[in-house]
Design a protein with these regions (language model features):
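Short Gly/Pro-enriched turn/cap motifs at secondary-structure boundaries
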Residues: 23-27, 44-48, 54, 114, ...
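Central helical "cap/lid" subdomain
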Residues: 2-43, 174, 442, 459-460
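C-terminal catalytic lobe of FAD-dependent flavoproteins
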Residues: 51, 60, 82-83, 87-223
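Glycine/proline-enriched, intrinsically flexible loops and inter-domain linkers
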Residues: 174, 178-517
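Mid-domain catalytic core of redox enzymes
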Residues: 33-74, 91-94, 105
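Acidic/polar loop patches that form or flank catalytic/metal-binding clefts of enzymes
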Residues: 23-27, 43-45, 110-116, 170-178, ...
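Buried hydrophobic packing segments
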Residues: 12, 159-167, 304, 449
Length: 517
């Protein structure tokens, strides 16, 4: 077969592992019960009680009752034999009793009618309650469609159409960025991770989906070199792509802990102060979570020129903002590329896009090109705000005046004994620089920076403020504002493309979109 779709249900992880693919898929015990017949139960709609995590539906004149418990029991594959087919696990009455009692509170008739069937079987779930769909980064033309999270029947029709179009046309007929199998980084596919995280995710199915909700299990797997230092300074961390990032900083004796609400949450006043500090003076945020790739060799320019819609053939020391497009002109990646010298580049992308961008880079590699994922080798500090130059000039001999250190340029400089790559860029629309620091030197450089910033009240800034600052400026974020279904013209980014620079992927589609306006 030219193309293969893996639809192996809870066996998909084991099947995929045989060919070197790790899927964050894990089975848990999943219960339902069926009552005795109810004469009055005909043509009733499905009902869900989200407060209790229970669903009710008619089943041939009887009522089927299922639930998604917060204390789900994981089910390792050792419990599921090779000939396991429509089989069952023993029923733990003590485990399910609270759910049965809750169901009877909603429908007292259940207690009067009685239970005819108790069922307990394995069902597969994912680490974030979203499907695993699409082409795998490891093997060309190998697709997966699994991780239905007990929603397989509801999703079947739509998924069938999406995959039929995908196989025939080469791309999906709907926007499925959230469910892209490439969203999970390597640390999110280990056995220890899925055994810890997925039972919690199952219990979140019917829970209130609070803004900025953070899971509790399988945390602190990838950390910035500054993690402990920032924790001591009040950081409240959130996890994206398996990486712990400081989202906001507690002050004035407050606890660095989320209190969830659909109104302004408890961190709003702290975040607002961070936002204003960047606009009015200077702030520093740890963006070490960003993906960082080194591309080198005599073919490195050809590789990046083929992928990028912007012109990457710039002088060493220039930094280019660009997109990587698909053949339809859709935006597959939104990133920056710094040219260090004639044959070496840094590619900087977001943590949530790390795996898909790394895959896209290596699948389009030209001869005589070497790539390295250096994401964990370098920490990154972004110093932003009108006073950023004053602070940074204290700790480096580099001349930071406009005429000497222009926007969109970078160079290697020293801060103390540490050589760092320093580039003048801003994702928040202020004067600022990004400092790429060897991980081993990160704490020392950070403390030096803080001392230099005392005069200007240098403020620790979290990712919540970074997001609102970039929104205020109108900067795009891949996966939220733009994705593979959007072209440059629709996104207001047509000025980035330089079609005269070379035959980049998506060039013809871009020119057609530009002509249409």
């Amino acid at each position: 077969a030219k193309k293969i779709i893996l639809t192996g249900g809870l066996w998909s992880r084991e099947i995929a592992k045989k060919i070197g693919i790790d899927l964050p898929l894990y089975a848990c015990e999943h219960y339902y019960v069926v009552t005795e017949a109810m004469a009055e139960l005909t043509q009733r709609p499905v009902m869900r009680d989200f407060d209790k995590g229970i669903y009710f539906k008619e089943d041939a004149g009887k009522m089927l009752i299922g639930w998604f418990e917060t204390n789900a029991v994981g089910c390792p594959m050792s419990r599921i034999t090779k000939d396991f087919s429509f089989d069952e696990f023993p029923v733990d009455m003590e485990h399910i009793e609270p759910h049965l009692v809750a169901a009877m509170e909603t429908f007292p008739v259940i207690g009067e009618t009685g239970i005819r069937t108790f069922f307990n079987g394995p069902e597969s779930f994912t680490n974030d309650n979203l499907h695993l769909l699409g082409p795998t980064p490891e093997i060309d033309n190998f697709y997966v469609a699994c991780g239905m999270n007990s929603k397989g029947i509801a999703a079947a029709g739509g998924l069938g159409k999406i995959f039929a179009d995908w196989i025939v046309d080469g791309y999906p007929s709907g926007e499925i960025t959230e469910t892209d199998v490439r969203r999970n980084n390597s640390v999110q596919t280990t056995q220890s991770y899925i055994e810890a995280r997925i039972p919690e995710a199952l219990g979140h199915t019917y829970a209130m989906h609070w803004p900025f909700y953070q899971y509790h299990t399988a945390r602190n797997l990838w950390q910035s070199p500054l993690h402990d230092t920032l924790l001591e300074q009040g950081a409240c961390f959130g996890e994206v792509g398996g990486f712990e990032r400081p989202n906001w900083f507690a002050r004035d004796g407050a606890e660095a802990k989320y209190e969830y609400s659909y109104n302004r949450q408890n961190w709003f006043k702290f975040y607002a102060a961070e936002h204003l500090a960047v606009r009015q003076s200077v702030g520093v945020y740890d963006i070490s979570s960003f993906g960082k790739f080194e591309v080198s060799g005599t073919g490195s320019l050809a590789t990046l020129q083929r992928l990028s819609c912007a012109d990457i053939d710039v002088e060493p020391g220039k930094v280019v903002y660009t997109q990587w497009l698909n053949n339809r002109g859709g935006i597959e990646a939104d990133l920056t590329i710094a040219r260090l010298d004639d044959k070496r580049f840094y590619v900087i992308t977001g943590i949530a896009s790390l795996k898909r961008d790394w895959s896209r880079l290596n699948k389009n590699i030209q001869p005589d090109t070497q790539t390295r994922d250096i994401s964990m080798e370098l920490a990154c500090l972004s110093v932003q705000g009108p006073n950023s130059r004053h602070v940074l000039q204290k700790i480096t001999d580099a001349d930071l005046k406009n005429i000497e250190f222009k926007f969109g340029t970078g160079r290697f400089v020293y801060i103390g004994d540490s050589q760092i790559w320093m580039q003048r860029l801003s994702y928040v629309g202020e004067l600022g620089w990004e400092l790429f620091v060897p991980a081993s030197d990160a704490v020392t450089v950070f403390k030096t920076l803080q001392q230099a910033g005392e005069e200007y009240k240098l403020c620790n800034v979290g990712l919540h403020a970074l997001n609102s600052l970039r929104l205020e400026k109108g900067f795009r974020h891949w996966g939220h504002d733009i994705a593979a279904e959007d072209n440059l013209v629709q996104a207001g980014l047509g000025f980035i493309a330089k079609p005269d620079a070379g035959d980049f992927i998506g060039r013809e589609a871009f020119l057609m979109a530009k002509a249409k306006g």
